[in-house]
A protein has these predicted regions:
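Polybasic low-complexity intrinsically disordered regions
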Residues: 1-187, 192, 197
Length: 198
């Protein structure tokens, strides 16, 4: 796993944990969790590291603190409903394996992280995709436009935004009926990204 990828995961883990801790009343937090809110903690955790081994240890620390926080709030329905806690509940199993025998979470290798796993603590719908050798984090947009030479102006006739793990052809297939109904479409020209075997 490259340092850049690992640093990104560590930063994401910090953001998720911090949001979850801020969603909790301070009086239920142990000191180990309160320190995450200190400004110096972020600097020490994310930037004062020596090598991949230390980064993995810090990532494991974030997972452990998050798992402990979920145990602390598990009987508090009012807190479990909060956004920061919901994000943490999703994040931990995406980033770690649970060993039922040891009752511990262990950080997953980068290759074991699913493409639809959380990429941002602030926008949980953002996904990761490696498309044609290029890495993309975010969403994908498909736009349909008129393209007849006789039109004085070409007009956007349809657009769709979705998780970027969805293929172009799948998005077109979902929107084609609507586009045809709205535009009286007779011919459709597409780029190579929309091709797929049926």
């Amino acid at each position: 796993m490259t340092n850049i990828k690992l640093a990104g995961r560590l930063s994401l883990a910090y953001d998720v944990l911090r949001q979850a801790i801020k969603a909790c009343p301070v009086d239920i937090l142990p000191d180990s969790h309160k320190k995450v809110l200190d400004p110096g903690y972020k600097t020490d955790t994310l930037y004062r590291l020596k090598g991949t081994g230390e980064r993995m240890a810090r990532l494991q620390e974030m997972i452990d603190l998050g798992a402990e926080l979920l145990i602390i709030v598990e009987s508090r329905a009012d807190i479990l409903k909060r956004h920061g806690i919901a994000i943490l509940k999703r994040f931990i199993p995406e980033q770690a394996y649970y060993d039922f025998g040891k009752k511990l979470w262990t950080v997953k290798d980068n290759k074991d992280i699913a493409a639809n796993s959380m990429q941002s603590a602030y926008d949980p719908d953002v996904t990761y995709r490696n498309k044609s050798g290029k890495r993309h984090v975010g969403a994908v947009t498909n736009i349909s436009v008129t393209c007849a030479d006789e039109n004085p102006v070409q007009v956007i006739t349809d657009y769709t935004v979705d998780k970027n793990i969805k293929g172009d052809s799948e998005m077109l297939e979902e929107r084609l009926k609507c586009i045809k109904e709205r535009t009286n479409l007779t011919d459709l020209n597409i780029d190579g990204g929309f091709w797929r075997k049926h």
